[in-house]
Amino acid sequence: MSILSLITAPDPILKKVASPVDTVNDSIRQLMDDMLETMYHNHGVGLAAPQVAVSKRIIVLDLSKVDIKEDNITNSEYKYPLFMVNPIVKAISNQTATAKEGCLSLPKQAIEVSRYHEIQVTYLDYYNKLTTLNAEGWLARAIQHEVDHLDGILLVDYLSNLKKEAALNTLSKIKDAAYDK
């Protein structure tokens, strides 16, 4: 496995709608393995292919190390890591929850986002098997966050123009400080 370079805002690839994958083959599995390694290396819980400069509809997730205690949901209900190709999300109920989210493509930013609390996601798994998963709470939030990346939507897109500009300016200063070292 390899650690891939992370793409950060405002890179234009993050604003493109990613292309569907025809079939999950060995090269797609290798990409997913590399994405997972990259996610772990950067202490993330989810990663979408556009975040590593690949415009394909692929996400990986692993919330197993996140301490989740909400609505009697435990992480042990899900088998991690999750590999999702061409995920399609459908809300199961209209109930939403608002919480702060971080993003590997927007380092050191935490942005409040309202998302569906309970979803159903249909996707091709690691072995090209069509799979349906019902998720709620933080897993539902993480899936929706990563699917946003596949649709060219970033966390800052949920902010007003003024707050979005401030967040991107902060990110620019962080990048400049890192570059100067």
Curated annotation (Swiss-Prot):
Record GO terms (molecular function): metal ion binding; peptide deformylase activity
Function: Removes the formyl group from the N-terminal Met of newly synthesized proteins. Requires at least a dipeptide for an efficient rate of reaction. N-terminal L-methionine is a prerequisite for activity but the enzyme has broad specificity at other positions.
Cofactor note: Binds 1 Fe(2+) ion.
Entry keyword annotation includes Transmembrane: no
PANTHER family hit by this protein: PEPTIDE DEFORMYLASE
Cofactor: Fe(2+)
Gene it is expressed from: def
Catalytic activity: N-terminal N-formyl-L-methionyl-[peptide] + H2O = N-terminal L-methionyl-[peptide] + formate
Keyword Hydrolase among record annotations: yes
NCBIfam families reported in the protein's UniProt record: pept_deformyl (TIGR00079), PRK00150.1-3 (NF001159)
Protein name: Peptide deformylase
Active site positions, chain numbering: E146
Family (UniProt): Belongs to the polypeptide deformylase family.
Transmembrane segments: none
Binding site for Fe cation: C103, H145, H149
EC number: 3.5.1.88
GO BP term (any one): translation
Keywords annotated in UniProt: Hydrolase, Iron, Metal-binding, Protein biosynthesis
